Amino acid sequence: MSAPPPSVLSRPSRRDRMGRLLPPAAAWLVSNLVTWLIASSSVAGDGSQVAYWSTAGRRRWDAEHYLSIAKAGYEMFRCRDRYADYPDVICGNVAWFPGYPMSVRAVSATGLSYEISAVVVSEASLFGIFAVLWYLLGARLTSATGLTLAIGTVFPGGVYFHAMFPIATGTLALLVCVAGVKRGSWGLAAAGGFVATACHLVGAVAVGMLLLSAFFAWRRDTWSVRLVKAGASAAVAACGVLWTTWLMWQATGRWDAYEAIQQSSYGQSGVRQPFDEMRKAYGFPFGDWYRPEGHLPWLVEHSLGAHRGQLWLNAAFVLLVVATAVVRLVRDRRLGAEEWAAAILTVAVFLVPFFAGAEMSWYRNHAQMFVGLVLVGHASRWVQVPLLAWCSVQYALLGSMFFAGVLV
């Protein structure tokens, strides 16, 4: 009796494929469990108990805008046309990108409410985040990959992965973009980049990374083909911004709707001095502006200024990712395409909010530095274990700020 062909022997069975999903599934469950415990130890802004398993516990100011886009599309108007006592600035929801709310709209077609659909999109994206990270780490359980997944469950700012925000969806898209670069699939990389740019302005970092990919990816191709793949994937990714602009124009009649509301209502226009913005972000008085009512639990009381520790941790994480990349480059004389991509994206995600002037929202945008875990997976356990401990403490503090309504 002849043996089966090698292609059959090498093909993973259904049981093997399911087994490969167990570590990311476990990470997703642990992330929800940890976040629920933090919510249980916190209070809502009105002093009531946090209902983590309800949609109300996952909504913040921006979530209302994303839901409004999912329900009725874009709108822009002079505030005083509707609110007589309001400053004469522009109101509406054109300051928010469509990738996430359009996904929510698609899921709501199943009959689920928009609120539940929003949570489904966020949680499904979070599971996808762990699954793609697991693939990028080699899909083999070791102490290094296990610790990396553990860090991912308490990643800085990761509480927003569970919220009605595009952070999880945008992060998944960036990881898919990195996976496309690793596989040599410019189409997959372009698709991930498109979704990332359609979810949030920070996602535009994918365009820059894909342009640079000609120098570190597509290595089996000639230089001319590498340049074409890099340029084509970056162009497709940039179409996420064009789609956003087109949707806003269709609803408002203005191609500059996003820029107009940012400048009129939020004073954000042009490029800022990043170090000045870091200083403003560090000193922003969240605890004075948004203090929960009534008696505060210990965790909430000690978390009202947690964004300051968050900035230190985020800066340390960027330095760790860059240092790991440099060590691997010196030792091995090369980096994998996915490692180059992850390093570039991590640094860019850290800097973009400060160039844009996002002093009230940088901490959630920085959660997309999750892509840097691709490199952290190669770090020593003497680095990974302290990082896990630091991230765990900071995750609890920032999570408590979120559930208490201190963060927006």
Regions found by a protein language model. Give the residues of each.
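Transmembrane alpha-helix segments characteristic
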Residues: R333-A356
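Loop-to-helix entry region of an early transmembrane alpha helix in multi-pass inner-membrane enzymes
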Residues: D88, V94-P98, M102, T110-G128, ...
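Membrane-lumen/periplasm interface segments of specific transmembrane helices
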Residues: S31-G45, V207-F216, R220-T324, E338-A343
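Transmembrane-helix signature of polytopic, membrane-embedded enzymes
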Residues: I116-S117, L133-V154, L172, A337-I344
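Short hydrophobic/aromatic helix or loop-helix immediately within or flanking a transmembrane segment
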Residues: W61-L112, P353
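Multi-pass, polyprenyl lipid-linked donor-dependent membrane glycosyltransferases
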Residues: A124-S125, L147-V176, A196-L212, W362-Q368
